[in-house]
Amino acid sequence: MNIKIDTIKKIYSSLAVLVLLSVSHAGTLNSAGTAAGSQLLIPQGSENIALSASNGAAASGVHSLFSNPAGLASITNMSGSTSNGDYIADTQLTNFAFGMPLNGTTTIAAGIRVLDFGDIPRTSADATEGDGSTFSPSFYVAQLGLGRSISDRVRVGATGKIVSETMDDVSATALAIDLGVQYSFPSERLHVGVALKNLGSRMQYSGTGMEQTLVPDGTQPGTNNENFSVTAADNPLPTSLDISVGYALNSNLMVTTSFQNYSYQLNTLSVGAKYHMNDVWFGAGTTMNVQKGDQKIGMSDVDWEDYTESNWGFSVGMGANIDIGTSVLSVSYSLRQSKEYFDDYSSLEVSFSF
């Protein structure tokens, strides 16, 4: 009993440190858009998308790689998932994940997600309409996570990730980790989760594309050109602290909410609900920006609203489990509304467990 009490005390102490770290680096309007690795902010997993990323307290299975790694501890069998989604501006988002238990309390999972931008016409200062050739950026995130059940109520997890971005002849790479905790109150039907995400190194682009051939300043006419290398700025990853709560209204319906405290953009609040009946589930949610900062002088109310409100609206999703002998095949679909500028984000996912 004393061991459990000491463990819980350590967990709460860790959570307090995470909260203080996040609040001390909380984002404002002035820092919005200055973080690198924005692909890390794209929600992944049908249930996570459908609930507007509000399900961190109750996330489970291999999908927890992208929401709260503590949920990896719920994996009891070999399982995996693959999904493909239409993101903004004809960008394809593909994901593969696989997980398995190592023993009775510890699990391991790995995943990779790739952004496919297609072929983009190559332009330059001399060929602003394109020179007839194309290039295709390569963005991916590779992850390896561990989950562990401390008790029947407490789960913890950690995920290490490699973030890679390549555009033509320049590239950038960063390393990051996610840390998560989930706590359940069975008698109260309450779930609480905390996840510190994308804590890692800074990203800086480099490569032959940063090189230029110029005449040195202050030299005499006829001086030969020299090669110069431009040093790109290095930027931090979009670190965030997600504090989430889930409450089961009954055996079929759960409501969820999550507050995302970002370091380099406006904080957000997400709410959602999931209803499941037998082997079918339905989910819906929405997210909103939580303003932090005063309206800029001279900015109209309309411009201020456009500047501070979320680009995303409601989200919905559904899925079904199909028993195949001793295995389970799951098929799910989710959609996230884009308020303007781009098409909605939709994703089709297939998962298995055996």
Q: Where are the regions a protein language model picked out?
A:
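Short secondary-structure transition/capping motifs
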Residues: 83-88, 131-135
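Cleavable N-terminal export/targeting peptides
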Residues: 1-38
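Residue-level signal for alpha-helical transmembrane segments in multi-pass membrane proteins
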Residues: 16-23, 70, 84, 158
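N-terminal periplasmic accessory domains that precede
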Residues: 63-74
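Outer-membrane beta-barrel porins/channels
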Residues: 27-52, 93-354
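Short strand-turn segments of transmembrane beta-barrel domains in outer membranes
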Residues: 53-56, 78-87, 336
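A short, polar/charged loop/turn motif at coil->beta-strand junctions and beta-hairpin connectors
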Residues: 45, 74-77
